[in-house]
Amino acid sequence: IPPRNVSLSASISRMAAVAVLAVLCTACSVTRRLNDGQYLLQKVTIDTDGQTPKEERITAPTLEQYVRQTPNKRFLGTNFYVWAYNLANPDKDNWWNNFKRKVGEEPVLLDMSLTEKSVQNLKTYMNSRGYYASTASFEVDTTRRRHRAYVTYRTRQGQPYRIDTVSYDFRDRSLKTVIDVDTASTLIRPGDIFDITMLDKERERIAAYLN
């Protein structure tokens, strides 16, 4: 069994290596090639509606799918992949520079048109879930660190629209009789939130049942 002090030394060495990597990625600034008015998208946060009951609340991970811009992936808390990409000489096309670009990631720069589109997407999605009184907005902070942008999306669901009554209308009345027999299997009921996704699933269920 190796002495405890040897194991401790190895742990310290690993921690030191991580610290050195973080310093290198910071020292070799990942924003050094950016022009005035350009910002690396450093972080995106979604502030969800805490006033909505937890069982009805649309979670941040769900909403993230409708955000058009997300930051570069990170390694050990650093912008390592952007740093690796920036090591490549943009004026040279050879295997070594191509390797750096392949290992790294092209910097994701703040695009306000995509930010605004993201807000529209968030609002549209909340509407589809029955929250027609919902709101979505955003804030961009470019003062925290030079050439870096921190975007916060704020969503408020509001009160949902709920289903009052459910009825089925078929041109062929014989189909209505068949469906009425199977109402116990319906996916939508009075009192449920008016969710377009569930309406689509109910249509699919009926089509499968009739087949």
Predicted regions and their residues:
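Bacterial N-terminal signal peptides that target proteins for export
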Residues: 1-16
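Alpha-helical interaction segments
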Residues: 17-18, 199
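C-terminal motif of bacterial Sec signal peptides marking the signal peptidase cleavage site
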Residues: 24-27
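Interaction-mediating elements
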Residues: 29-211
